[in-house]
Amino acid sequence: MSLAGKNVVFVGGLGFIAYEACKYLMNNDLASLFVFDVLDKPEAIKALQEINPKTKVYYTKFDITNKESIKQSLADVISKVQHIDALINGAGILTDPNVELTMNINLIGLINTTLEALPLMDKNKHGRGGVIVNIASVLGLEPCPPAAVYCASKFGVVGFSRSLGDPFYYEHTGVAVVTFCPGLTDTPLKNNIGSKYTFDYSKEIGEKLNSSKTQKPEVCGAHLAQAIELMDNGAIYISNQGTLTKVKPSVYWEPTY
């Protein structure tokens, strides 16, 4: 999908990987970029706008744990530009001791945002199709013993996204659903993991993860923008150590008819 002239909504767009992706997107002649975030960083929004004055950048204070905030924020986008062409769900935290907050932000909020946006993008309703990219993690594909709650939330994102990425939904709506799984990236999410393990004693098995090789957020952000452009329904992409790879998950069970 060419991004030129498109309207993009980026949830959690001021995070490290997300912000790098936003900078990349601003060089693609978007019609508009809506940045939804709980953080308020006017200088960051200003810097985005300066990349390409022709693309209108909007900032919305956004609480992904509040369904009314989700509904009103997306309705505001429609009132301003009529159509959403791409939605990126990028909000996320790593704080295993707070199970409810982890699930509410990483999974439930993402689900609610997707379910609210999809009918607005549906080509058979008032939309014109497009793409939804849900940011999971490589830890949504493989277990992570020291961060079991975070891992569970990201496994949920993968399962939810793969389900909505079924051809049945794409043929009906014209909206591709893509899963993007960053590997370990040099961001505060990874750097602060030491105090956020599932249990205090999980640190014993978490130190290797905390000291493993990472990639730069600029590289991961560029990969994310590429995944948006590819608009490959049902695809799962891993961004790891500078390489973007499409992966095919194993099939362990299929219904018998």
Swiss-Prot record:
It is an enzyme of class 1 (oxidoreductase). It holds the Pfam family adh_short. Keywords: NAD, Oxidoreductase. It catalyses: a primary alcohol + NAD(+) = an aldehyde + NADH + H(+); a secondary alcohol + NAD(+) = a ketone + NADH + H(+). NAD(+) binds at residues 9-33. Belongs to the short-chain dehydrogenases/reductases (SDR) family. This is Alcohol dehydrogenase 1. It comes from Ceratitis capitata.
